[in-house]
Design a protein with these regions (language model features):
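Iron-sulfur-associated redox domains of electron-transfer enzymes in respiratory
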Residues: 84-421
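Alpha-helical scaffold segments in carbohydrate-active enzymes
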Residues: 66-69, 73, 257-261
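Conserved hydrophobic beta-strand within the GNAT/NAT acetyltransferase core sheet
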Residues: 59-60, 220
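N-terminal, well-ordered alpha-helical segments
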Residues: 43, 62-65, 72, 146, ...
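Iron-sulfur cluster-binding cysteine motifs and their immediate structural context
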Residues: 18, 27-36, 40-59, 69-90, ...
Length: 421
């Protein structure tokens, strides 16, 4: 029996107006195959009714109260994610979100409204190619993120960092982790290419388990969609208590065009189809459009175009035009910098402060290839604009009603699916 039918048969009680239930999120996002596993719905639920299922997707763990928040804050549901781009402080704020700058048109081309697009990478406060001065074992592209977090921990600027580390039980599967020491940050260094439902992991009980006070200051490292959820929750007035992400004082987005399903990518495509035991893998990277897998001796055992693995990508990622992580205080990734370095984009006062604290630990030089960032940013936007079934507008209201979503997506390959339970 479907969740909708159960609800409709509940003692004939008329539904209060304006409610959106978990079942709508389930139909419009999860069962429609559009969930991007950011964990925002788990984090935002005030009654802790949503949990993380065995398949790493949101599930209803107890009665839904119909508060609508899981729908409202989902980047594939009711959250107009591009509206979070305007929530970053700084003079470039308005310019970065202006619609005529995000159409995906080539620089120099008119957009049909009398204006010319400006590269999004040109709207940040600062931009560098950077790496850690000290080697970080296993660190990605110069260990920049690890060095930043360690410097902030050492300075007492943050008490912990929400990040991803490799699972202790499933090889090459990422899991969320709250690191509270430089040693824990170093142990989690490197990139793994599946989502972790990370925001669903963060709550006050976690702080207590990790020996942190209720007012602990945290950095969050994640994909742009995770940052979108954090910034949206920060912007909402919480009349009862606070949100579970109030402790996050710094967001670091990892440049991202898509994330992958662990089972499909590592278990099926890598281990089963290509005959590579997961325990034999020492490193996985995406370098210049190639998926590169190496063994523990750094011998390359797979080097193929990443497009060969797109069947394992999360379907909902195609709707995201936020490769650069435009809502984040800092964005970091390999595109635009030479091997062994990371691109660092600074957008906010919090980002500038973090960089200043960590500056002595980093080697900074001018961003080497901003045009590479711009090219991939425009390609990412074009893909999203073709895939989205709704208008893309950072200046529109932040939240999208479920009925509006239903109207936009009905009849498409991303239409809501009501599954029997």
């Amino acid at each position: 029996m479907s969740g909708f039918k159960i609800r409709d048969e509940m003692n004939g009680v008329r539904e209060a107006p304006g409610k959106t239930w978990f079942w709508e999120l389930e139909a419009g996002v999860i069962d429609a195959g559009r969930c991007i596993q950011c964990g925002t719905c788990v984090a935002v639920c005030p009654s802790d009714s949503i949990a993380i299922g065995a398949d790493d997707l949101p599930v209803l763990a107890k009665m839904c109260t119909g508060c609508s928040l899981c729908w409202d804050f989902c980047p594939r549901g009711g959250l107009r994610y591009e509206a979070t781009w305007t929530l970053v402080d700084g003079l470039e704020n308005e310019a970065r979100a202006a619609p005529w700058k995000i159409t995906g048109a080539d620089p120099g081309e008119h957009n049909g409204n009398g204006t010319r697009p400006v590269r999004a990478v040109d709207t940040v406060r600062e931009r560098y190619s950077a790496r850690s001065r000290q080697p970080v074992a296993g660190g990605q592209d110069g260990g920049l993120v690890s060095a930043l977090l360690i410097a902030l921990l050492d300075a007492g600027e943050i008490d912990g960092a929400l990040l991803a580390r490799q699972s202790e039980t499933e090889r090459w599967k990422a899991e969320p982790y709250l690191a509270t020491t430089p040693e824990e940050v170093r142990a989690a260094a490197g990139t793994i290419y599946n989502q972790t439902m990370g925001l669903g992991y963060l709550d006050r009980k976690l702080l207590s388990r990790r020996g942190l006070p209720p007012d602990a200051r945290l950095a969050a490292v994640g994909t742009p969609c995770e940052v979108q959820g954090i910034k949206a929750m920060h912007a909402r007035p919480w009349h009862r208590g606070s949100s579970k992400v109030d402790n996050v004082v710094l967001t670091i987005a990892l440049l991202c065009t898509k994330s992958f399903n662990y089972e499909k990518l590592m278990v099926e495509l890598v281990a089963a189809q290509r005959g590579i035991p997961l325990e034999a893998i020492g490193r996985v990277d995406v370098i210049r459009g190639q998926l590169v897998v190496q063994d523990h001796e750094r011998t390359t055992i797979i080097e193929e175009p990443i497009k060969n693995f797109h069947g394992a990508a999360l379907k909902g990622c195609d709707e995201c035009a936020d490769f650069l992580g435009n809502a984040a205080d800092l964005s970091v990734g390999s595109v635009g910098s030479a091997d062994g370095r990371s691109t660092l984009l600074v957008r906010s006062e919090a980002g500038s402060r973090a960089l200043e604290i960590a500056r002595d630990c980093l080697e900074l030089r001018d961003l080497e290839r901003p045009e590479a960032l711009d090219k991939l940013d425009r390609l990412d936007k074009r893909t999203a604009f073709k895939t989205l079934k709704r208008p893309f507008d950072p200046e529109a209201p932040m939240f999208i009603d479920y009925l509006e979503h239903l109207e936009r997506y009905a009849g498409s390959d991303r239409a809501p699916v009501v599954a029997d339970r």
